[in-house]
Amino acid sequence: MEINNRVAIGMSGGVDSSVAAYLLKKQGFDVIGLTMRVWVDHEAKAFDSDKSCCSLKATQDAKKVAEILGIPHYTVDLSKIFYDKIVNYFVNEYLKGRTPNPCVLCNRQIKFGELLEKAFELGAYYIATGHYVRKEYDEKTKRYLLKKGIDSSKDQSYVLYRLTQKQLEHALFPLGNYKKEEIRALAEELKLPVAKKPESQEICFIPDNDYSGLIKRQVKDEIKPGEFRDVHGKFLGYHKGIIHYTIGQRRGLGLSSDRPLYVVDIDVKNNVVVVGHQEDVWGEELISSNNNFISIEKLEKEMKVTAKIRYTAKEEEAIIKPYEEDKVLVKFLKPQRAITPGQSVVFYDKDVVVGGGIIERKLK
């Protein structure tokens, strides 16, 4: 496909993507607005919440903004493929005792996968989003780089670490050099109807934030009560089913103890939730699998990086090195709290994303 100036922007009906669309138009791009229709749990209590990025109101808001900006707008029904690839993954990970981040998978497979294909069909060379990240091309390595947004409080590079070189080639991130308050101020200046809209905090397909409720509705009979045991194997009581627990969790265990108890492991095979004290929750080493690298083609030798083990975590110094098959051994210089299988660990070299992978297990 020849490079052209047509760009399709994913519009969620929120402030960020709305202003991103305006900025692209101002820069001279031929802009098309696309809003994804994804599968949403209709039985969730807050299904029609205006805060949800998947509500009918959100789609109407996106259309309104597109009209104001004078750009065409289309709704793309991706509900079936979203359910098959994202919702099923989310549910199955919890059934395996893991805690997934569905946004990471959605960005690679849906937003920069299915939606990018739709952009191509509409004659666009680029797909854009309202993520707070930057993209650069490194002439030396001939690779596209993903860099943190300049607003450190809003940087979203963690959820985009799985993007491929082809996806990055076609990606535009208009907000990477802005701070959030500048974007909201611009929305107000433009008198966009979404200027004061609050940010969506929940996972888009679970508007009431009730993960276990969603999972129960999908799998029904597969969730069985089991035993709580301590780190020495001593029986402490019964749990409601492993989907209700994640590593580091303290609330909702229903166990009495002279010291606070935390989930430290989930033994799926035996349907046991292992609990321990605060010191049992910390670890320094982990194995990541299903890794994706951006600034380098492949990890071939030991490398010093900073890394974080969840979206809200602080980056910490670590050493990464190749492990058996295509896995990576990550050794942090300081202990990390609640290394959680299923979450992503993302590696950085200053403000550049080196890559990352899915946490398979804590080593020690």
UniProtKB/Swiss-Prot annotation:
Catalyzes the 2-thiolation of uridine at the wobble position (U34) of tRNA, leading to the formation of s(2)U34. Residues 154-156, 310-311 are annotated as: Interaction with tRNA. GO terms for cellular component: cytoplasm. ATP binds at residues 10-17, 36, 130. One of its GO terms (molecular function) is tRNA binding. Its main location: cytoplasm. It comes from Thermoanaerobacter pseudethanolicus (strain ATCC 33223 / 39E) (Clostridium thermohydrosulfuricum). The record marks 131, 343 as: Interaction with tRNA. The active site is at residues 106, 204. InterPro entries: MnmA-like, MnmA-like_C, MnmA-like_central, MnmA-like_central_sf, Rossmann-like_a/b/a_fold. Belongs to the MnmA/TRMU family. The gene is mnmA2. Transmembrane segments: none annotated. It catalyses: S-sulfanyl-L-cysteinyl-[protein] + uridine(34) in tRNA + AH2 + ATP = 2-thiouridine(34) in tRNA + L-cysteinyl-[protein] + A + AMP + diphosphate + H(+). SUPFAM superfamilies: Adenine nucleotide alpha hydrolases-like. Keywords: ATP-binding, Cytoplasm, Disulfide bond, Nucleotide-binding, RNA-binding, Transferase, tRNA processing, tRNA-binding. CDD domains: MnmA_TRMU-like (cd01998). It is found in: Cytoplasm. Its EC number is 2.8.1.13. Pfam families: tRNA_Me_trans (PF03054), tRNA_Me_trans_C (PF20258), tRNA_Me_trans_M (PF20259). GO terms for biological process: tRNA wobble position uridine thiolation. This is tRNA-specific 2-thiouridylase MnmA 2. Disulfide bonds join 106-204.
